[in-house]
Amino acid sequence: MTKYVFVTGGVVSSLGKGIAAASLAAILESRGLKVTLLKLDPYINVDPGTMSPFQHGEVFVTEDGAETDLDLGHYERFISTKMRKANNFTTGQIYESVIRKERRGDYLGKTVQVIPHITNEIQAFIERGAASATCGEPDVAIVEIGGTVGDIESLPFLEAARQMSLRLGRNSACFVHLTLVPYVATAGELKTKPTQHSVQKLREIGILPHVLLCRADRRIPDDESKKISMFSNVPEDAVISVWDADSIYKIPQMLHDQGLDRIICEELKLSPKDADLSMWSELVEKLENPKHEVTIGMVGKYVDLTESYKSLIEALRHASLHTSTRVNIEYIDSEEIETNGVDSLKHLDAVLVPGGFGRRGTEGKIAAIRYARESKVPYLGICLGMQLAVIEFARDVVGLKQANSTEFDPETPERVVALITEWYDRDGKVETRTEESDLGGTMRLGSQRCPIKPGTMAEEIYGKDVNERHRHRYEVNNRFVPQLEAGGLIISARTPSEDLPEMMELPRSMHPWFVGVQFHPEFTSTPRDGHPLFKSFVEAALANKQARGVKA
């Protein structure tokens, strides 16, 4: 039977519940347990697909095409279990399901209320998510409850967790509470009062935490841990210090050294083998001892909030691990390029344009792409970054001066990039879209097979056909492909059913390393294995730096 660990947060948001949950999962997996994770989001949106990256950060896409919270990306990077739609759900989905049941008459005329109907539905979603784990029936399901204790939005989720713990019985569920212990510089000490109040708030709901994870900018002294233990009624050895680290991949070892996994296993009456965290130690060793160094410019419009590109940043870090190269990322606002030109790019070893939506900043990105192409600087374009690379090539090489995307200019006569109106989803079902379709849940989503053209750089990089994850509604227009290919551009991968361009590149006679992909390879990169495309990109950046005579 699956045991459950509920992870809650207190005092403030953004303390790192997702990293803490993923790190615990990694330790338990290293002990031979089958583990899955779920994220419960208390916002009313059905999913984060239409939410602003400035508010929500990155939208992580699962293999089966769900637009989910970025924490699911952390889950997949820390453990081997793949996430699915059922691993993330929101208040919006819960209420949508309950209202649909009420309309069908499932409640037989009863008054539908938060308790028991909403809380029962939350429990059903949790158990369904755990049961659908790709690892088979999990030994442990770690359930991260979004938001902060005390938020009105989180109350139904916390109540559902309390009820579920009671229903499952002793040693079947436990609670881990992540809280802030701030350092007050003027007083010169850590303050435990916010944590005391946070635990008190949790106890008012009827939840008694078994473990406290205390976030601080430094290790919490024993005296403060004793005080927290006394006031929160949590054993002293279960008051665990989680201080700031320069790499999230150090957190599993940090938590294991303080006995978190031992406490959880004892509480859940599990007796797995000892933990083997040698892989994490090796990763940290590689991170801290690189042999080379490169600087890559990421040109986008969400650069003030790097959470918008979380998986991409991590994929570059994974590539650094597997190439022994420290990757420094410079975030460059594409609108500043529109105003000030491309001088800010001239010291870079490579340029990357990530995915995105909307017209704002696109001409700055196109200017950056033109600079990379003409200056022979390695270039990687992802999703929108590929589309803009095709537009730049069409304008400046092929001579289609009005080339554009219908996303930015619906009336452009040279629709080099246009809306996909029909495609097959990963289950073989035909999907159709028009300009009038809803924004939410209407993109080409999830993992799709990409056959690669023999003799291309793409084949050198991947070595075989691949399955990559997608999130887009616009695509390179096949009507212009003959003109683009006549100019030298190579379409190096296409979808097997609809013949949609999936990868483009320039031949080495035109450029040493210039690649665009319609999919999002960052979603499948892990610290264990890296990703061949990002490894090749970092190697190209290193070669460019060395070719310029700069010490790498």
Curated annotation (Swiss-Prot):
NCBIfam families: PRK05380.1 (NF003792), PyrG (TIGR00337). CTPSs have evolved a hybrid strategy for distinguishing between UTP and CTP. The overlapping regions of the product feedback inhibitory and substrate sites recognize a common feature in both compounds, the triphosphate moiety. To differentiate isosteric substrate and product pyrimidine rings, an additional pocket far from the expected kinase/ligase catalytic site, specifically recognizes the cytosine and ribose portions of the product inhibitor. Residues 1-270 are annotated as: Amidoligase domain. The lineage of its organism: Bacteria, Pseudomonadati, Pseudomonadota, Betaproteobacteria, Burkholderiales. The gene is pyrG. Belongs to the CTP synthase family. One of its GO terms (biological process) is pyrimidine nucleobase biosynthetic process. ATP binds at residues 14-19, 71. Catalyzes the ATP-dependent amination of UTP to CTP with either L-glutamine or ammonia as the source of nitrogen. Regulates intracellular CTP levels through interactions with the four ribonucleotide triphosphates. This is CTP synthase. InterPro entries: Class_I_gatase-like, CTP_synthase, CTP_synthase_N, GATASE, GATase1_CTP_Synthase, P-loop_NTPase. The active site is at 383 (nucleophile), 520, 522. CTP binds at residues 13, 151-153, 191-196, 227. It comes from Burkholderia ambifaria (strain MC40-6). Pathway: Pyrimidine metabolism; CTP biosynthesis via de novo pathway; CTP from UDP: step 2/2. L-glutamine binds at residues 356, 384-387, 407, 473. Mg(2+) binds at residues 71, 144. Keywords: ATP-binding, Glutamine amidotransferase, Ligase, Magnesium, Metal-binding, Nucleotide-binding, Pyrimidine biosynthesis. CDD domains: CTPS_N, GATase1_CTP_Synthase. UTP binds at residues 13, 191-196, 227.
